[in-house]
Each structure stands twice: as structure tokens, then as C-alpha cells.
Regions:
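Thiamine diphosphate
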Residues: 2-176
Length: 176
């Protein structure tokens, strides 16, 4: 809860703050309307370098290259695209011990209107479990600052990729 005179940050502002707190200035994303609120804030901020990728595995490759060059990176994608990134994660990011936080718009939950999103949305967490990929699900912005900071600490201390799944309950979802 915000104190007198403090403005409560929304979920997108909280993510931007956390990325800055963890010196994560290279942001690679596959465009998606549900994450537009956060990527537009990033795009407006000169601290960040925002790179649009055509596919999710390309985004992972760019982020790993950025980290190898000395610049912390994060990736934003949709859950259906997470399926596209599995090989890049399993054969590059995980064995190279690259700390890449991935912010994933998790589709297929309450309020989903597109049946094609449901199967992959349900498969994301079990796939992450099989890869040994730590993951957290954000359904509201309560204690979001602590969860994001803890996730970033885990990601960097263990030098491993990590997923932060953003649900439709958090960001409002897509409109049919």
C-alpha cells in the first residue's frame, strides 16, 4: 500500500523499476498487445535499448549475446511463443548458464477468448518444470515488488534463465 504522498505503481511500472534496479537495459521482445503497456514504457525511457524480434528463439539468442557482451538482458513474449523458444533455452541459454529473466504473457486462463491459446497456455508450466526452469506466476500486483526482486536475485545469483508469467488477471488480457 502506498503511503501518504506516494503513488502506487501499476504492474508495468513495477516491472520497469525492477529492470532498472537490476541493471537490465537490453530488452528483447516479440510484439504482443498484452505486454504493450510495459514495452511502451520501456520504449519511452532512454535507459533501455528495446529490440523487436520476429520469433521467440531469436529473442533468446539476442539476449544471450547481449549478456555475453556485458549487458544484462530480459525477454518479453507470449506463452504460445514460449513453445518456439524451448530449443534455444535448452541448447543455449540453460547450458551457457545465462541469467535471462523472461516475462511471459500466460494465455489460456480465466477470460481467454481464443481456443487456440488454451493448450499451449496449459503446457507452459509443465514444460518449464521439465527444463528445470524456475518460474513464478503473477496474478495481481500485490507484493509484486518483492516477487520481482526475489526472482531477479535468483536468476542472477544462480546464472540461469527464469520465467515470470503475467496472467490476464494481472494485465487485463486481450479483447476479442
Amino acid at each position: 500500500m502506498a503511503h501518504e504522498g506516494e503513488k502506487h505503481m501499476n504492474w508495468a511500472e513495477e516491472i520497469v523499476k525492477t529492470l532498472k534496479d537490476w541493471d537490465t537495459s537490453m530488452i528483447v521482445y516479440v510484439p504482443d498487445i498484452s505486454i504493450h503497456q510495459v514495452t511502451s514504457l520501456i520504449d519511452e525511457d532512454p535507459y533501455f535499448r528495446l529490440v523487436s524480434a520476429t520469433r521467440e528463439e531469436e529473442a533468446i539468442g539476442i539476449a544471450v549475446g547481449s549478456y555475453a557482451a556485458g549487458r544484462n538482458a530480459a525477454v518479453f513474449m507470449q506463452s504460445s511463443g514460449f513453445g518456439n523458444s524451448v530449443n534455444a533455452l535448452a541448447s543455449l541459454c540453460i547450458p551457457a548458464r545465462t541469467p535471462i529473466p523472461m516475462f511471459i504473457n500466460l494465455r489460456g486462463g480465466p477470460g481467454e477468448f481464443n481456443l487456440a491459446q488454451v493448450a499451449m497456455g496449459r503446457a507452459v508450466i509443465p514444460i518449464m518444470d521439465q527444463l528445470g526452469l524456475p518460474h513464478f506466476v503473477l496474478e495481481d500486483d500485490g507484493k509484486m515488488d518483492k516477487l520481482l526482486d526475489g526472482a531477479m536475485k535468483l536468476c542472477h545469483a544462480n546464472r540461469q534463465p527464469l520465467a515470470i508469467c503475467l496472467t490476464q488477471m494481472l494485465h487485463g488480457g486481450k479483447i476479442a
